[in-house]
Amino acid sequence: MGSADRPALRSPSLPPPPPSPPSPLLLLLPLLPLWLGLMGPGAAADGSEPATGEGRGGARSVRVDVKLPRQDALVLEGVRIGPEDGPEPLLGGRLLLMDVVDAEQEIPVDGWIAVAYVGKEQVAQFHQENQGSSQKAYPKALVQQMRRALFLGASALLLLILNHSVVRELDVSQLLLRPVIVLHYSSNVTKLLEALLQRTQATAEISSGESLSANIEWKLTLWTTCGLSKDGYGGWQDLVCLGGAQAQEQKPLQQLWNAILLVAMLLCTGLVVQAQRQASRQNQQEPGGQEDLFKRRVVRRLASLKTRRCRLSRAAHSLPEPGTETCAVCLDYFCNKQWLRVLPCKHEFHRDCVDPWLMLQQTCPLCKFNVLGNHYSDD
């Protein structure tokens, strides 16, 4: 097939543009689970450690009305830890301080409430025992009082902790079926303690308030002693095991939230890895990116240049006449019906000869006119 029968040069399809660089926001996605963890369920509003929601029972605010002989009634506030299922039983009865009570003479037959006390001396001893120890210990006096209250059949346990700094370091148990009330420190707590130390007969009624289980952290801690809880003098009720290790059971909502955070972290990690791979591939293609862009510009320019078919007289079909124009690239004569490329400088060449030249040089072979711009080359 001769050059005259070749089809006209078509603009080649442009290669796809390089992929856009990854958004910088993708690099911030791994911080999303951390932000969700701080804003989600269990986050502490005061900057302290978030609540873990451990233990089977919920925490509810309570009001304790204490009646003392020949004195005004004392109103105390605190937190009750107990089972959330079903209506809560009404708590009330005589208050007995376990540190000074005589079990054989003062334990009443009807329901009564045990009072456990941790004073400044016990707290100081507690901190001294914990210094240099990697394993957490608890105030021995409080543990002994709680054990004694369980075995003597107390219907509830009232904790008087004058120094509440120990509450953050002490795991407070809901003691199975026996609710625990932790009182907030106030002047009335001091008055109640003074009355109980003087063996003044006091009674209390406990009424519940709204749920605080989402804001307060409580942990279920068991000890290593088992026995039967006594329900007055008439018999034995409930097997109580104070034993072993700390049970850590999270609420279903907290477990679901942890699963959501885990999935979000995995998705964010995958997106970051994909963005890094895409950026790596783009960096590998970067050295040739400018060259490809320049070639596409030259191809578009060639497609816009004029072409024409060579028309010779019949006499010049057989032998070229003297003075017939030639292609300055291949030095061959122009033949009839050949495709010629007409440059902006009006010079003509064989299209198949000058196009490869222009792809490399971008200038007219005769006058050095730059086909990409309206100026002449300095070469």
Curated annotation (Swiss-Prot):
Side of membrane Cytoplasmic, spans: 1-24, 274-379
Residues that carry a glycan: N188
Any GO molecular function: zinc ion binding
Recorded topology in the membrane: Multi-pass membrane protein
Sequence segments annotated as region (Disordered): 1-21, 44-63
Domain of life: Eukaryota
Keyword annotations: Glycoprotein, Membrane, Metal-binding, Transmembrane, Transmembrane helix, Zinc, Zinc-finger
Main location as per UniProt: membrane
Extracellular side: 46-252
Transmembrane regions: 25-45, 253-273
GO CC, any one term: membrane
Residue spans, zinc finger RING-type: 327-368
Cellular localization per UniProt: Membrane
The keyword Transmembrane is annotated on this UniProt entry: yes
InterPro entries: Znf_RING (IPR001841), Znf_RING/FYVE/PHD (IPR013083), ZNRF3_Arkadia_E3_ligases (IPR051073)
Name recorded for this polypeptide: RING finger protein 215
Record organism: Mus musculus (Mouse)
